[in-house]
Amino acid sequence: MSADYWNSSQRNQWQLTRFSLLEARRRVLLLERKMIQNGLIKDYPNIIYDYNMRIYLHNLLIKLGRRLNIRQIALATAEIYLTRFLTRVSLKEINVYLLITTCIYVACKIEECPQHIRLILSEARNIWPEYIPHDVTKLAEFEFYLIEEMDSYLLLHHPYKSLMQINEFLSNNYNVFGFKLTVEELQNAWSLINDSYITDLHLLLPPHTIAVAAIYITVVLKKNLSRVRQGNNNDNNININTMHISTGSSTNPININNNNNTNTSNNNGTTSTTTTTTAQETQVLGQDDNTEMNIDDLMNLTKSSNNSQDKSDDKMDIDNPLQSQVNLSQIQNQTQHQHQESTHNNTSSTNTGRNGINGQISQSNQELNNFDLDILDEDTIKINKFMNFLEHSHINLDEVVEAVQDMMNMYVLWNRYNEQGVKKALQVMLLNRI
């Protein structure tokens, strides 16, 4: 394992493509069918590794991590272990509660914050007494099973470090790029990275790409959010659910309060937060950010700001997450075009001034009346500077777009998350084994 990502086993052994990941999961399904046909396991059609299951497992992992006061880095490592393991093993042949406990146990060892095996097992039994055995040897056996399926490649690089490095670079080169992250933006980006572990991004893309995508959502789409909210101030006839994108407390990242649905589920333990952290992490996550984003706002964030003129386009069909598209290149070209227009207007004003003082005053007044005030907006200026940084960074913008799309789609699906359905399906499967 190398000290840098580019020579690491994470990149050389476990960085997959969309196709290879799909093939791996297809092989798991084929193996699952053979085991069912041979009578080795029973068939439970409701057990599906979809986003409902992923969010549920994410919440379980965070819940146990809180009980043990485990650092966020260790929890992130455990979640990647979980994702890797489930690319090779079917959910129907394992105890997912014991798997989560084992992932945390191994991750704490790797991240140098070890927890005693009896302590972890005891806390897990307090939370899930029906599913966690008393025998510590079961956890020890599962540990070897987990390590074997991951081919003993356990060390990981996370986007958190990349986020801090980017923030430090921007702060040190503020005179060059004129852009740096505020404490609030840094905290929001950190929280977005927390939630990104629900997706497959950490098996597909480098950590720095995910960090840039989190910054992109925090900084660039913040401008579109303000426009959407201004454009939708009069559209209060539809009751939309509330979504928390960033939070530094125990607030649920998605708080569903739909008055039109009588079967409202109480989602316990949903989080996008951290527990006990290092001194550097505490500086980022120490504040409680209660910024709320409306799900309708979130959907409109994925559109170009040019579409804000069309009221019918302000309401996307949230039932189709594939409509959630973010074109980074388009926004980049838009900001460059704004720069060119600004330069052209300033040049025109200067040339007019050379022809006479009266003409200069008249032209300046006319331009002031017709000038696009958005170019003077603080958020727009910050976006332009961020795009300038991306242009000089040589970061793969296609990968950034891919990461942003996956993260936005994840929040769309999270809004339809059904915890009780997943919990009940797992209960039926696991209790029938006893």
UniProtKB/Swiss-Prot annotation:
It is found in: Nucleus. Keywords: Activator, Cyclin, Nucleus, Repressor, Transcription, Transcription regulation. Gene3D superfamilies: Cyclin-like. Pfam families: Cyclin_N. The keyword Membrane does not apply. It comes from the Eukaryota. GO terms for cellular component: CKM complex; mediator complex; nucleus. One of its GO terms (molecular function) is cyclin-dependent protein serine/threonine kinase regulator activity. Residues 248-292, 301-320, 330-362 are annotated as: Disordered. One of its GO terms (biological process) is cellular response to heat. Residues 248-278, 330-359 have a biased composition (Low complexity). Component of the SRB8-11 complex, a regulatory module of the Mediator complex. Component of the SRB8-11 complex. The SRB8-11 complex is a regulatory module of the Mediator complex which is itself involved in regulation of basal and activated RNA polymerase II-dependent transcription. The SRB8-11 complex may be involved in the transcriptional repression of a subset of genes regulated by Mediator. It may inhibit the association of the Mediator complex with RNA polymerase II to form the holoenzyme complex. The SRB8-11 complex phosphorylates the C-terminal domain (CTD) of the largest subunit of RNA polymerase II. This is RNA polymerase II holoenzyme cyclin-like subunit. It comes from Candida albicans (strain SC5314 / ATCC MYA-2876) (Yeast).
